Amino acid sequence: NQLNPHFLLNTLNNIYALIAFNSDKAQEAVQELSKLLRHVLYDNQQTFVPLEKELDFIRNYVALMRIRLPQQVEVSVNLEVDSGGALQIAPLIFISLIENAFKHGISPTVDSFISISIFGHTDGTVRCEILNSNHPKSGQDKSGSGVGLEQVSKRLELIYPGHYEWIKGISENGQVYSSILTIQTKSL
């Protein structure tokens, strides 16, 4: 239930570099990081948080990740709740999926994309769909150990046993990785 420590260190380094050429943007980034850390440190202690609050966390996370992205990476984010704010979700349940997209979906040399869509419906269904470019790591790179996704599976089984569906995989042409997680929150 935590953020990758490398994310925090990279973000601080990016903010440090940003100070030299755009202090206003650096101040914004510090505020976004502060909101993000507040959520991780305090809201994470609860079993469930309002979906809207979790979506705000994801917006802050993506805003911080965009600071370090090369120009050729297109990021689209669509986060909506049509439940009137009543939906509750386990905190940070989606963050490993999103981190994965930023970690494995970006190439420094080839155009890349990340698409993040999360919808909360009045029937209690929350659907998270993440699509990203598939840039397989080399054989020597052990950064893709799968531990993050394994942790997500364990948390889903613990919190939402029998009330979720998670479909993930690589497209036939090998170009796109998709992760589609649907959780039925009202049946708990």
Where are these predicted regions, by residue range?
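Short, charged/polar, Gly/Pro-enriched secondary-structure boundary elements
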Residues: 185-188
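Two-component histidine phosphotransfer core
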Residues: 1-171, 176-182
